[in-house]
Amino acid sequence: MLKKSSKKSIKSQEKYMRPPWDAYFMEIMRSVAKRATCDRGRASSVFVKDKQILVTGYVGSPVGMPHCDDVGHQLRKTIHEDGTITEHCVRTVHAEQNAICQAAKRGVPLEGSTVYVNMTPCRTCAMLLINSGIKRVVAANKYHDGAESEMMFKKAGIKLEYLSEDVVKYKKQKG
């Protein structure tokens, strides 16, 4: 015969706390980043609408092309007006761009969605996100060269939220 215990177990006394939606989708974004194939960011994105995932993307080379992790970076130098020289890897497609491509291939509208990203999207990705009709960007960190993107999102009426004020900076980059 089993005896009923009058004492509740410690485990049953601890109340389980479900994560808020933003934390939940950011954790998924971090998992998606594990598929990234360029170590200069390991960026990813998750597009969500009405608490449902629409599409995900991660930084990687175009289909069938070699990956940075396998053959190294394809760096391009830029000489800026102030004389500063920076380098940017051009082998890969950015996470936001890959997700937008996946949405287009599958016929998934992104209008009115929220995108969860590692850092402030670059200028080109910001333009694509604006034209995709997103309403909100949630970024884990700031991008060292993200000021122009921040301004563009503001002008477009897109809400940009940061979970951290930490700034992501790459080697040989301005900012």
Predicted regions and their residues:
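Zinc-dependent deaminase catalytic domain
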Residues: 1-175
